[in-house]
Amino acid sequence: MMNVSRPAIHPVDALPVAPTAGAIDRPPVRMKDVQGMPGTTGGLILRLSQFVPALISVSVMVTTSDFRSATAFCCLVLAVSLQSLWSLSLFIIDAYALLVRRSLRNHSVVQCFTIGDGVTSTLTFAAASASAGITVLINDLGQCNVNHCTRFETATAMAFISWFAVSPSFILNFWSLATH
């Protein structure tokens, strides 16, 4: 049997290290923190760039009186609402992690972010594509004077921009899971 000292049996007091003169208290740089990952400044900016176009898209679409006339437009409102809630939630989580200097590199957290980004980006892309198709159809039929084609186009474009901003988050998180 080996004589091994356990901290629970023989506690050892750790003396605090005195800071050196002129040293700045910064958290150490972690090599695996790639900008755009959860808990980084780049991730915070990506979440904001996902949230703002999604919010604009849902706001523009809801202010039209006839968006309920096509299922694709209703689907767009639903998908972009989900995207804006998801992005806002993760923006708040990223901001909190940056304020308290916590890492969000936990495997379960990154897996949750990856699945959520994948689901919301797929829904947003599908709804934006369907809305673009209906908008083109309305334009080709020459019914833009009756409908709100400009608003439909704006909402669809903002949904595509939001989807485009989700893609780097999803790819970085998926890459992190694959290399873990």
From Swiss-Prot:
Transmembrane segments: 42-62, 73-93, 118-138, 157-177
Locations listed in the record: Cell membrane
Sequence ranges on the Cytoplasmic membrane side: 1-41, 94-117, 178-180
Key words, A-Z: Cell membrane, Membrane, Transmembrane, Transmembrane helix
Membrane topology field: Multi-pass membrane protein
Ion transport keyword on record: no
GO cellular component assignments: plasma membrane
Membrane topology, Extracellular segments: 63-72, 139-156
Quaternary context: Homodimer and heterodimers.
PANTHER family attached to this UniProt entry: CASP-LIKE PROTEIN 5A1 (PTHR32021:SF1), CASP-LIKE PROTEIN 5B3 (PTHR32021)
Protein family according to the UniProt entry: Belongs to the Casparian strip membrane proteins (CASP) family.
Protein name stated in the entry: CASP-like protein 5A1
